[in-house]
Amino acid sequence: MQFFESTIISIYPLYVLREKQKELQYVKEYKPAVEDVKHLRVLMFGHVGAGKSSFINSVSNVLRGRMSIPALTSSTTSDRRRGTSKTFFPLVFNDVMGLEDGNNSGIHASDITLAMKGHVKDGHKFNPIAPLTKEDYGYNPSPSLDDKVHVLVCVMSANAPQINASVLQKMKKVRETASELGIPQMAMMTHIDAACGEIEKDLKNVYRSKHLHKKMKDFSAAVGIPMNCIFPVKNYSDEIDLKDDVDFLVLSALRKMVDFGDDFVEKNLN
C-alpha cells in the first residue's frame, strides 16, 4: 500500500504536465467554425469577491506562459486573451461587478440579461443605481451572434461566508434567464486553497477534500448547477512563477468553456 501511494505521488506531476499541455494545445488551436463569429464570449458573474477578475488574470498568465500584470477590477471588462506570440485567442471575457444584497448595490440582474442577449456594448460601465436602457449610449440595438454571450459562468468563492439568500436568488434568476435563452452554464469554485488546509498544503488534494466536495454540493443545490459542471480552481495571487497544477485546473475550466461555447454557436447558426 505504501509503495502504491508513493508511486501515485511520483507520477502525479507527469500526469498533470501531460494533461496541461494537451488542454493548452486544444485552446490554442481552437477557432469558431462559423465565419461570422470571431470569438467565444464568456460572461462571468457571482457575488462580490468571488475571484472573477483574478481568474481572467490567471488565464492570461497561463496562455502567455508567464506571469503578467494583473488588470484592475472594474464594473465591466471585455478582454480578449493573448498568447505568447502576441496573437489573440478567440475568447472574450465579460466580467461584471458582483451581485450584492439590496436593489441599489452591485449589478442589476436585468443588466446581465441584456448582456447575455448582446445588447451591451463592449466597455460599457454599469451603474448600480440605474440599469441600462435603450436610450443609453452603451445599448446595442442590433446584436449579432458575435455580440451575444455563448457561455455563462457563475463564480463562487469556497472561502466565502454564507451567501445572503437574496444574492442566491439573483444568481438563480440569472441562470433561469440563461436557460430560457439556451445559453450553456457552468460554475467555478475559487479560493479552494484558502478554504481547505489539505489543498493549501498540496493542490493535488483538490479531489480528495471532503470539505471542498461538500461546498460544491451545497452550491450545486443552492443555484441548480450540476456537480459535473462545477470546476474547482486556484487563481494566481502571490506566486511569482507559473505552476503546472494551478495551470491544469485553470485550463480544465477553460476547456469546458470552449466546448460549451462552441456547442451554443453551432446550434444558433440560423
What name fits each language-model region?
Residues 40-64:
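Glycine-rich phosphate-binding P-loop
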Residues 210, 214-225, 237-240:
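C-terminal structured domain segments
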